Amino acid sequence: MKNEVKKVVLAYSGGLDTSIILKWLQDEYNCEVVTFTADIGQGEELEPARKKALSLGIKEENIFIKDLRDEFVKDYVFPMFRANAIYEGEYLLGTSIARPLIAKTQAQIALQTGADAVSHGATGKGNDQVRFELGYLAFNPDLKIIAPWREWDLNSREKLLAYAQKHGIDISKKKGKSPYSMDANLLHISYEGLVLEDPAHAPEEDMWRWSKSPKDAPNESEIIELDFQKGDLVAINGEKLSPAGLLTKLNELGCKHGIGRLDIVENRYVGMKSRGCYETPGGTILLKAHRALESITLDREAAHLKDELMPKYASLIYNGYWFSPERMMLQALIDESQIHANGRVKLELYKGNVMIIGRESANDSLFNAAYCTFEEDEVYNQKDAAGFIKLNALRFIIAGKNGRKF
């Protein structure tokens, strides 16, 4: 394939690894390279990526830096949270949900620039290679895919650094740069590697980049109100913001109060177990609030069906099938369930905890105090329960009469 590629679009961060990939593509494939850097809220200045690409010989017209923050939250994060999606009971899918948007945009740039190939920096051990490549092929099945980590022999840090030095790639470390493998966007930041590769070893406190330790969080709690329309967050404390602005604000509140830290061992799609630590402050608050709103606006069986389907939906996202017909079918069902998910949720934030202290919906609440009061009521005849119970016990009664023992 090396002699067949004419132009390749590289998912480029400006960091050491993707800068090495850029040079490697030029040398090994002898092709024109286009760089694409996505701003999905990782919190880093992106202009250095442009300068780095220029220094490595990339033409100005072949450098693409795109602000995708609002699209990321509106079209990916919010739809996922309508489903209350959690992978293996804990993981809020912060890395998984970002990959489809990057892959889609990268494929679009390939079409725009006439590139016949795309490339990414995901390793051959992880899930991201699957997520990126499923996304590419969903948009353009004719694209050639170059995954350097599956091809080259630069399989150690020493070899990578030696290659960088040989080709004049800057390897100076930024002051305060974390030694962990990290990935960040508006939804979360993740940490892998080093001491975390021993699941018995506790993460060090200085690893956490975003949030205060719950022990160091304010001694005073903070009460906030979140407004929802059709399952999506629209305002915080009455203030309407853009989708990215809303998640940014929730992150600030969560970080302040030590919310959203997670240390898990997860099952990767490729088959191995992997330990990761995550900070998802805003997402943790959002999930709790959304479920609280659904508790008063969703019909019981609709809510239970959603809960049954959620693990499948979460696995599809984790494994890279965002653009699959089955995910879209589930999304249509989920979105239908959110028509009445309108209202306000009041929460109290305190030292790592998110506590629901109120929920209301002016027009869509199914909670009716007249039916569930412990006081005398005029709408519910308690004698009706006897027949309901007897009918539901009928199979037990028949089995018992036939001598069955339970």
Swiss-Prot record:
Binding site for L-citrulline: 91, 96, 127, 131, 181, 190, 266, 278
UniProt keyword annotation of Nucleotidyltransferase present: no
Reactions mediated catalytically: L-citrulline + L-aspartate + ATP = 2-(N(omega)-L-arginino)succinate + AMP + diphosphate + H(+)
EC number: 6.3.4.5
Pathway annotation from the record: Amino-acid biosynthesis; L-arginine biosynthesis; L-arginine from L-ornithine and carbamoyl phosphate: step 2/3
EC primary class: ligase
Quaternary structure (record): Homotetramer.
NCBIfam families: argG, PRK00509.1
Family as reported in the entry's similarity comment: Belongs to the argininosuccinate synthase family. Type 1 subfamily.
Name the record gives this protein: Argininosuccinate synthase
Gene: argG
